[in-house]
């Protein structure tokens, strides 16, 4: 396996109007005079480790040069501010990027092994609930998108934004809570089992919101109504195992096209309870699938493991707990299956694994 070695000198942390912030409680990474490479080496074997780094950026900022810099920084996941898959509305809100740039950024990031998350913002100016639902439907029906994770941030009005004036002038009117909750229920029903909804509301104090939903328990209300109607969200967050949950887990495979390449979503799931214990995202890059040279030579000819994650409560390194999903061999079995698929089905001679610095030991 190849843990995405860096061949260039470490870059400084700062990315064209995008802030690279590493939030951690690890003193090993907070030493003021430590060079990035030295801090990364220390973190590989530290008692407390940073095992992944996520950054947020705009789709139009993503190019091959930027991606190389993200690799140097140890980034493992990139969140794109997609907002809505509708060029008319993106132009209206002066977003200054297009859906074509969202698709291009997604393909570059996937082919470099990153996990990809989207931010969607229902209730933007010019949008209707039907527009928002169509955007969510396209998100997973169109293979040019299909993100791994999703954050839903319904639009609200704050005084510091230009939208505040639009609202005062009557040019913008947010959805009422009833409309918003029903829209979110419909959106959650569209999300496939390989994707994860991480957020359903943004943490903005209700005292700062002039218009729009001020409900801090929006996700809970959506889930309550879905349960009352016998509906279930099948996103990963709603299905992942909780502390101490028993289960009989079997290896499950889902294949789908994405960004010009092929994805195999491998997982250990309990069919009876629809719980998920462990997952692996394996990718045949678009370059390899279409017999083109990879623009990143270190990944030439390799299938990519973009994520390996076991859920449940944390178990220490080299430890085991009978009531936990971690350290039961699920991850090892998924890696072995990924190697088999890459070698026997896709004709790849090697696998490259993107891993957080603290997960490489």
Predicted segments — roles?
Residues 79, 151, 304-306, 352:
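Conserved beta-strand positions in the central sheet of alpha/beta enzyme cores
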Residues 171-289:
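C-terminal accessory regions of radical SAM enzymes
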Residues 340-355:
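Conserved GNAT acetyl-CoA-binding A-motif
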